[in-house]
Curated annotation (Swiss-Prot):
InterPro entries the UniProt entry points to: Cation/H_exchanger_TM, CPA1_transporter, Na+/solute_symporter_sf
Biased composition (Basic and acidic residues): 1-10
The gene coding this protein: SLC9B2
Subunit structure of this chain's protein: Homodimer; dimerization is essential for SLC9B2 activity. Lipids seem to play a role in the stabilization of the dimerization subdomain.
Protein name, as recorded: Sodium/hydrogen exchanger 9B2
UniProt cross-references to Pfam families, sorted A to Z: Na_H_Exchanger (PF00999)
Ranges in the topological domain labelled Cytoplasmic: 1-86, 134-144, 190-200, 243-270, 325-339, 374-390, 441-461, 510-537
Entry keywords, A to Z: Antiport, Cell membrane, Cytoplasmic vesicle, Endosome, Hydrogen ion transport, Ion transport, Membrane, Metal-binding, Mitochondrion, Phosphoprotein, Sodium, Sodium transport, Synapse, Transmembrane, Transmembrane helix, Transport
Residues with Phosphoserine modification: S49
Length: 537
């Protein structure tokens, strides 16, 4: 012990050998001294090490406190910046929007008016989504904002004071939801990759088709015997429930993929790719069953009419898709804007006109086929069109989920109906989980990965909100009370499926992903190498 102290003292007092004495050399010498003092007695920190740690801690805390003070000064400055500036700006925009519409429409934009209700619902849905996004749990993905939008609309409808002043006509509500459905279908069609379609493995096909079809058939069976729906309406309900939600699955998969979980087996890629095909299959089945349910005549005629709607939708979509591949041509100005307007305008026209001409199931198929063929021809420009359509979706997403929530009234719900709807959703989801597990067997996944994929294929949201109210809107256009009751049951089940499965599915993916999926080994090695390099430096 004494020899070591003498050696340390000698090294500290050693004279310079002609080299320039710099602060960095002094820091290195000080760090070596502290390390050697630690080596003498590793269990008890020395006074020097304690002082060094406290000084480092103060240096780390000082910039943080300075940042908070600087932000506060910017916020309270004149003119203000930061949070206060954003709040004032957003409030001004909201008030200005209302004032401009009021100056044009008058009483329609006052409390109780139609436009007033739409504006209030729109901003309340946005605020609801933002508030839900503030709920952050450690090591878990954030809750989907669409859930906050859904709850905002539900609260507006079921709080008497607010409901008396926020009134939206059924025709306006139906039209806005149909526009949102058109945007979703365009995004789904453009999102399909023709090269990926050719390279799809059997497991991706099984995953996109098997659970959707089995859940649709199970839900139809349950709806017929538990809810008393006719078989046509049972399958409408089944295909509403059969779709998985990309709005929940894709962000969660991207988080896991960024962390390196399941990348080696391609689990996130598989789920994101199969999700699009799962949704398209559900929408196609829904449109076909919708056409059959609202057609009159014999069963054979209804089935043939459903097939005819599919043929009309595919044929019309093919013609329009090839048309907008070449018009406008690539040498025109503002090419992306023109293509975006054409694909959105034609999709909205297809959805509305199909209902007008008595073929409600053909509009959605027409939009899907048209967007897919247009995207194949646009190649590199497709991404720019998708960006603009994503902005349109950001505008209509709060309206869609807010309007879906506002359709559900507690006063009109019977307790036994709610219980049967929850039972239908629960049993159908359980069958879907088991079917998904079977579909990924013999695909090279281990038991933990199969369990994760089964639970990750659970969330429902976007498609249920988009098509869940279409049957009710179509029933209202026919003016039959019994059909409206069937449509209300379908909408209630869709609402409950979003409310139950969206948060549970998101939490399960965040909890089970790091525990059941393997992390890529080379990422860990890279981190270790980087750590060793930083220590050596």
């Amino acid at each position: 012990m004494g020899d070591e102290d003498k050696r340390i003292t000698y090294e500290d007092s050693e004279p310079s050998t002609g080299m320039n004495y710099t602060p960095s050399m002094h820091q290195e010498t000080q760090e070596e001294t502290v390390m050697k003092l630690k080596g003498i007695d590793a269990n008890e920190p020395t006074e020097g090490s304690i002082l060094l740690k406290s000084s480092e801690k103060k240096l780390q805390e000082t910039p943080t406190e300075a940042n908070h003070v600087q932000r506060l000064r910017q916020m309270l400055a004149c003119p203000p910046h930061g949070l206060l500036d954003r709040v004032v700006t957003n409030v001004t925009i909201i008030v200005l929007l209302w004032a401009v519409i009021w100056s044009i429409t008058g009483s329609e934009c006052l409390p109780g008016g139609n436009l007033f209700g739409i504006i209030i619902l729109f901003y309340c849905a946005i605020i609801g989504g933002k508030l839900l996004g503030l709920i952050k749990l450690p090591t878990l993905p954030p809750l989907p904002s669409l859930l906050g939008m859904l709850l905002a609309g539900f609260l507006i409808r079921n709080i008497p004071v607010i409901n008396d002043n926020v009134q939206i006509k059924h025709k306006w509500s139906s039209s806005l939801r149909s526009i949102a459905l058109s945007i979703i279908l365009v995004r789904a069609g453009l999102g399909l990759d023709s090269k990926a379609l050719k390279k799809l493995k059997g497991v991706c096909v099984r995953l996109s088709m098997g659970p959707c079809i089995v859940e649709a058939c199970t839900s139809a069976l349950l709806a017929h015997y538990l809810l008393g729906l006719p078989w046509q309406w049972g399958f409408i309900l089944g295909f509403v429930l059969g779709a998985v939600s990309p709005a929940v699955v894709v962000p969660s998969m991207l988080l896991l993929q960024g962390g390196g979980y399941g990348v080696e087996k391609g689990v996130p890629t598989l789920l994101m790719a199969a999700g699009s095909f799962d949704d398209i299959l559900a929408i196609t089945g829904f449109n076909t069953c919708l056409g059959i349910a609202f057609s009159t005549g014999s069963t054979v005629f209804n089935v043939l009419r459903g097939v005819l709607e599919v043929v009309i939708g595919v044929a019309t979509g093919s013609v329009l898709g090839f048309f907008i591949q070449y018009f406008p041509s690539c040498d025109q100005d503002k090419l992306v804007c023109k293509r975006t307007f054409l694909v959105l305008g034609l999709s909205v026209l297809a959805v509305f006109s199909s209902v007008h001409f008595g073929f409600p199931g053909s509009g959605g198929l027409c939009t899907l086929v048209m967007a897919f063929l247009a995207g194949m021809g646009w190649t590199s420009e497709k991404a720019e069109v998708e960006k603009i359509i994503a902005v349109a979706w950001d505008i209509f997403q709060p309206l869609l989920f807010g309007l879906i929530g506002a359709e559900v009234s507690i006063a009109s719900l019977r307790p036994e109906t709610v219980g049967l709807c929850v039972a239908t959703v629960g049993i159908a989801v359980l069958i879907r989980i088991l079917t998904t597990f079977l579909m990924v067997c013999f695909a090279g996944f281990n038991l933990k990965e199969k369990i994760f994929i089964s639970f990750a294929w659970l969330p429902k949201a976007t498609v249920q909100a988009a098509i869940g109210s279409v049957a009710l809107d179509t029933a209202r256009s026919h003016g039959e009370k019994q059909l409206e009751d069937y449509g209300m049951d379908v909408l209630t089940v869709a609402f409950l499926s979003i409310l139950i499965t969206a948060p549970i599915g998101s939490l399960l993916i965040g909890l089970l992903g790091p525990r059941l999926l393997q992390k890529v080994e080379h990422q860990n090695k890279d981190e270790e190498v980087q750590g060793e390099t930083s220590v050596q430096v």
